[in-house]
């Protein structure tokens, strides 16, 4: 389940792709060209657990899909050092991407210490611009996890700075009450 961003306000709901994410080439192409989907998550496993089915549907329809991870999951495993956790989580994410036939891209933020700075805005904008997406999906901005909020803000800013050149959608973190006030507009 996802929610589309509006150009005027981050939470504005506008009409999205009909039957978004279904395995239907008519919904994932423009003028005969397959759309490129980029999913941006704060941590390894966020893209897959939040919208892995949508990613797979786009791949099955012949579209290129990229998963951008803002961190390497350094704080993701209790009892492990940041380096140990990162090595495990990167391997898991890379393996998940192989299963889904998705390209992984890892950025340089640190899990649990994500920040919004000029340099981080630039890093996110450049990573997204390099992929030339038609559609980007990222975290809903009203989320109890601070890394998810940072990720959402950086992606939203990239959308603006790149001149609204791609459709922006938000995904819900399926962990209970983590995503707040999220009402999907597309499925």
Describe every region a protein language model picked out:
Residues 3-11, 21-40, 115-187:
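Metal-dependent de-N-acetylase/amidase catalytic core
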Residues 81-90, 105-131:
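Catalytic-core regions of hydrolytic enzymes
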Residues 75-100:
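Glycine-rich phosphate-binding loop and adjoining beta1-alpha1-beta2 segment
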Residues 70, 97-112:
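A conserved beta-strand->alpha-helix junction
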Residues 37-44, 48-82:
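ATP-dependent adenylation/pyrophosphate-handling site
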């Amino acid at each position: 389940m996802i929610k589309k961003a509006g150009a005027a306000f981050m939470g504005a709901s506008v009409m999205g792709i009909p039957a978004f994410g279904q395995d239907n080439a008519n919904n994932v192409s423009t003028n005969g060209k397959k759309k490129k989907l980029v999913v941006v998550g704060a941590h390894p496993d966020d893209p897959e657990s939040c919208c892995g089915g949508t990613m797979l549907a786009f791949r099955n329809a012949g579209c290129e899909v990229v998963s951008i991870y803002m961190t390497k999951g350094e704080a993701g495993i209790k009892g492990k050092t940041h380096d140990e956790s990162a090595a495990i989580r990167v391997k898991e994410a890379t393996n998940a991407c192989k299963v889904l036939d998705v390209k992984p891209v890892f950025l340089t933020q640190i899990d649990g210490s994500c920040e919004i700075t000029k340099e981080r805005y630039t890093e996110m904008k450049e990573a997204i611009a390099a992929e030339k997406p038609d559609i980007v999906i990222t975290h809903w901005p009203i989320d109890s996890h601070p890394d998810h909020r940072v990720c959402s803000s950086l992606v939203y800013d990239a959308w603006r700075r790149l001149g609204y050149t791609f459709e922006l959608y938000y995904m819900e973190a399926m962990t209970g009450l983590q995503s707040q006030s999220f009402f999907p507009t597309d499925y």
